[in-house]
């Protein structure tokens, strides 16, 4: 009779693990090297964001959204601003829409660059993150030149954007596009055909399209499994319906397909950015960049120096805030990680009655057990990397 040793381990992956992307704790049950169960423990970065928003005016709630997915801050603000605008029933001018779309796509590139390069680092490639961060640095400077802040911009406000873009900045963003595509080709050359990178990602973390819908996936996760579902095309907001871009889809639903989709999406984002830059320098060169009804957007500084009414108006907007008609609304945007939704309930006062945040990463993380079961221990880091989890939005 042969003796067979059963080697069952229970190990902790994180919360201080470099591949855990923040403060994730996974409790893994292993049979030798094979993963039998993955139990994500979340809540280590919980700050009570949704409850805090209920105590702030509609304008004061904006900065909380920067701190959710802090890799692409403006995309989160976008969903909130659209929700408030929907309740107020206001339209924002075309220049404001173009600026928003431009910076949303910058956010998408920021997020995908970080994800693609750090996922490469998780499986052992050390060069891509250095190249990726070099490009992200330039984009952070564009954030800073628009809003004064590199990360927590609070730039998209209900009613438009906080301030106009100088023409030189728009030109510089246009000039950045082509050299970036060259840098992207370099990362592409390094990873896409790389034997080791492919062995670590092809046929790992496969999800069928039915499972995607069942788990509530969105964004790259759904497109990797073959559905051309993108809110920018399916439920267009701002001026996306006037812009030309393609939606890449995968056919295997594995880590490698998701990586390829993120690479193509960055190129498509550049394509959208070029169209926005062209319009901001031609037909939308001048004009208002935020709502002009004066009920939501504070008066200009110059006006406040001359007019007492403007000063009083400014004071009221920043102390009491504006009252939003009672009602409820759900607004979603195609954030880099998936469908980022804001469910906003107003009771007619100057503060939200309830603000539910639907973070895409939350739905993706809960499928860790389903995706990793039966894989090797080393694949857990690769699967986690391809989900693109950021803990600010998961724990809120």
From Swiss-Prot:
It comes from the Bacteria. It holds the Pfam family Complex1_49kDa. One of its GO terms (cellular component) is plasma membrane. Keywords: Cell inner membrane, Cell membrane, Membrane, NAD, Quinone, Translocase, Transport, Ubiquinone. It is a peripheral membrane protein. GO terms for molecular function: NAD binding; NADH:ubiquinone reductase (non-electrogenic) activity; quinone binding. Its EC number is 7.1.1.-. Its main location: membrane. NDH-1 shuttles electrons from NADH, via FMN and iron-sulfur (Fe-S) centers, to quinones in the respiratory chain. The immediate electron acceptor for the enzyme in this species is believed to be ubiquinone. Couples the redox reaction to proton translocation (for every two electrons transferred, four hydrogen ions are translocated across the cytoplasmic membrane), and thus conserves the redox energy in a proton gradient. Belongs to the complex I 49 kDa subunit family. This is NADH-quinone oxidoreductase subunit D 1. It comes from Rhizobium etli (strain ATCC 51251 / DSM 11541 / JCM 21823 / NBRC 15573 / CFN 42). The lineage of its organism: Bacteria, Pseudomonadati, Pseudomonadota, Alphaproteobacteria, Hyphomicrobiales. The gene is nuoD1.
């Amino acid at each position: 009779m042969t003796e067979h040793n059963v080697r069952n381990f229970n190990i902790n992956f994180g919360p201080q693990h470099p591949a855990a992307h923040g403060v994730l704790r996974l409790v893994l049950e292993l049979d030798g090297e094979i993963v039998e169960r993955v139990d994500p423990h979340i809540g280590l970065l919980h700050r009570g964001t949704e409850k805090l928003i209920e105590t702030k005016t509609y304008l004061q709630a904006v900065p909380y959204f920067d701190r959710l997915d802090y890799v692409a801050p403006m995309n989160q603000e976008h969903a909130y601003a659209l929700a408030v605008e929907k309740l107020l029933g206001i339209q924002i001018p075309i220049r404001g829409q173009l600026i928003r779309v431009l910076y949303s796509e910058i956010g998408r590139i920021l997020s995908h660059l970080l994800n693609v390069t750090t996922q490469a680092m998780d499986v052992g490639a050390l060069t891509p993150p250095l190249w990726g961060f070099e490009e992200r640095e330039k984009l952070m400077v564009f954030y800073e030149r628009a809003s004064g802040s590199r990360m927590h911009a609070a730039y998209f406000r209900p009613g438009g954007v906080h301030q106009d873009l100088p023409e030189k900045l728009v030109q510089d963003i246009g000039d950045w596009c082509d050299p970036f595509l060259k840098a992207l080709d370099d990362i592409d050359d390094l990873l896409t055909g790389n034997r080791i990178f492919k062995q670590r990602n092809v046929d790992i973390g496969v999800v069928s399209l039915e499972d995607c819908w069942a788990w509530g996936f969105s964004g790259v996760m759904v497109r990797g499994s073959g559905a051309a579902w993108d809110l920018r095309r399916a439920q267009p907001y701002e001026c996306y319906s006037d812009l030309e871009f393609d939606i890449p889809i995968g056919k295997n639903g594995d880590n490698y397909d998701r990586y390829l989709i993120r690479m193509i999406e960055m190129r498509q984002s550049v394509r959208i950015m070029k169209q926005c830059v062209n319009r901001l320098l031609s037909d939308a060169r001048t004009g208002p960049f935020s709502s002009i009804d004066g009920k939501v957007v504070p008066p200009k500084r110059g006006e406040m120096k001359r007019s007492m009414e403007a000063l009083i108006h400014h004071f009221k907007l920043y102390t009491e805030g504006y009252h939003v008609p009672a009602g409820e609304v759900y607004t979603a945007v195609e954030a880099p990680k998936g469908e980022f939704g804001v469910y906003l309930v107003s009771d007619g006062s100057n503060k939200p009655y309830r603000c539910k945040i639907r973070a895409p990463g939350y739905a993706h993380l809960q499928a860790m057990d389903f995706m990793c079961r039966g894989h090797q221990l080393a694949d857990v880091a690769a699967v986690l990397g391809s989900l693109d989890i950021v803990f600010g939005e998961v724990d809120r």
